[in-house]
């Protein structure tokens, strides 16, 4: 059986890098991208430099994937940026940057991936939202709005792409164990985690487990769904 082709955005570090390693271990051929070069290598992984919000760069990346592999089985839209500012202190440039990366980038990759997946009449797309949406976190108005847009985008795309055998779902992680969260004062983090049914930070494995479910062939009747982790 041919190895599945899995494309993951935002793989330079963090959860994106973890997912690349995770799916290589599962015998996937993984293609990844980020806005800059990576300082690591992995057998079974191929990296491209691309800004997800740059349509020309995105089309060029997919042309390479089409030329080399001919098909695409999975897309994981991990790339995203956050901005934590009170609305009165948020410059317009930040608004554009967050929306371009989180919403426009997700749309462009979904659109181009679906064109490739059509050929096989099969595909799995997993997008990233955030627990900041249901938790309505203060200081994250633009970030939360962008991630809410990803949920609705996912639900509409699920309907539009169902006839092609493509499912589109979304995972919404709670705060992850990262350098950023470790710098947050303990009292503030405790208040945040107390809003979850399971009051702890998420780890990369938690996110991968949810994505694994969406990618399974047996999940062919699951589409347009959002899984928020931690019971928020």
Regions found by a protein language model. Give the residues of each.
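C-terminal substrate-recognition "lid" of short-chain dehydrogenase/reductases
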Residues: 107, 122, 200-229
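Alpha-helical segment proximal to the catalytic Tyr-Lys
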Residues: 115, 159-163, 220
